[in-house]
Amino acid sequence: MEERGMNERVKKLRKLSVDTQPHIDLERAKSMTKTYEKYEGVLSIPELRGQVLKDYFATKTLYIGEGELIVGEKGDSPQAAPTFPELCCHTVEDMHVMNDRDLINFKVKEEDYKVQEDVMIPYWDKRSTRSRILRAMTPEWKKAYECGIFTEFMEQRGPGHTVGSVKIYEKGFLDYKADIQASIDKLDFMNDPEAFDKKSELEGMKLACDAIMILGERYAAYARELAEKETDETRKKELLQIAANCDVVPAHKPQTYWQAIQMYWFVHLGVTSELNPWDAYSPGRLDQHLNPFYEKDVEDGILDDEKALELLECLWVKFNNQPAPPKVGITLKESSTYTDFANLNTGGITPNGENGVNNVSYLILDCMDEMKLLQPSSNVQISRKTPQKFLKRACEVSRKGWGQPAFYNTEAIIQELMNAGKSLEDARKGGTSGCVETGAFGNEAYILTGYFNIPKIFELTLNNGYDKMSGQQLGLELGYATDFETYEDLFEAFKKQIKYFLDIKIQGSNVIEKIFAEYMPVPFLSIITNDCISRGKDYNGGGARYNTKYLQGVGIGTITDCLSAVKYNVYDKKTFTMAELMQALDDNFEGHDRILNLVRNKTPKYGNDDDYADDIMKEVFEYYRSQVTGRPNMLGGMYRINMLPTTCHVYFGDVMMASPNGRLAHKPE
């Protein structure tokens, strides 16, 4: 394997990160369970959640690897995957599956099977959020979920998909704690019926502040302890500087470029240790956040580009050390990856509308180019004001063919965010995160609820709502394919089925939203999300400035080609009958070579600049958008759509019969 990294230190750290086998770490689960046993019913739920993080950070195993400059791991070591039984309590069989499966496996210590069986399952099996969710869902929701009509992100993970703002570089957690106390002092218990609940939430935030500061204090002490034993003078100085950095952050705001990177990483650990949010916390506009520290340190003579790049590459290793929480069942099938989808935005424009490219932007491109890691994901925002030099350098990195950076249009992002009700300033500070989703960084809870299998719903439409794969009546009984005399009649039935399943999905999502708001607040994430402190409300309870829920439509190309095949061949050209097509689908096209050739090769297709197909695509998209976007959610915001599959098209295809576009049964959409 080719070694990568700017110097020997980074090469060694990168190699360790890439070569280390991901493994299950139960330390967090055991600590959290003890906290619940001690404090459940004594503390309010927000305070209990703050205490969980505090107890974990006060006792967790510390790790400073050889040569590390940025410190902190979510678990006991690189590639450790803590479990979150309060969300999803895995069975012992699940643990064996994680350990034994060929792909995306997590090794489990022999003694941890017994801990899971004797401690975790008895305490968490019935009280986990996953169990609460499944008890609360309707039979219609459960059937649709189990048969692959849609997935549910919150079934094994927490709401997340949020991004950092400049705020964490302007304040330390002592400052946040003072802000929280000021908000408590302003509560009006005479006139505000929510004052008591707000106080509980704010007290939980104070405990979360204590948690992250304890972690910093412990790392400062640990670095000094290692420095005392270190015989290499260069490394001793580095360890003492790490200790000095941890004396400052996270309790106080960072003063240097190195401290700013360490501050971000402590915050990242706080968010992803509190719960396992889908997707993980992202740095957002890291180049713009770090550049003031870079410029000051260069001016003061304590930083050069070589050191600045080295520190970035150490941060890249930290991202790659954190595998996504282990998944099982449908959740594994819908997103089978180690990556946790942290995503960096580089370039774009500043909050006042000027060119946002700076010296750190180029360093980040160099870092991407040298590291080529699975995590973090990286993109560049390209605006009308982006220098050609930056665009050219980004293209040089991208042309090497490893998928990064992705390219996004800044003006389109801003327009999309403003269309969704964001202010111009908040839109300019925003960007993309996770896969391709846009959001107002630091100001928005934009939570993904799951994938929606549009081609599967068309399959049900052709069969009177009946699912041949599972042998169940899932949809509305609106007629069989041969009953629809015109394409318009068929499409109207298809729309009714879409709305029926959207109603089921969104009703379930509203209930799930309330379950998380009541039972799984996230006081730490709430601290660093704008407006939660001033409102006294949790991120999971509507505290953010903007609260958006997304439902991802999957299979837009497949459904376009399916509808095109039916409209073009059955209704327009009459090259075969609907009955002949349905028989071909039932036979998985075996013995139907003529029909298969026609639908695959002689029919207008999506993505070919063919208005016949494109007009169908637009009609499907607009209907799906009209039925989702604008629906109110339970947090005072609205639902919106995305169109993306990640890896869910593989799972969705597996639960389907053959499709009219020539896709064979069980093949990806």
What are these regions (language model features)?
Residues 216-223, 561:
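Secondary-structure-rich domain cores
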Residues 220-221, 226, 243-246:
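Structured binding/interaction patches within domain cores
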Residues 2-204, 238-245, 249-557, 562-669:
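Conserved catalytic cores of very large enzyme subunits
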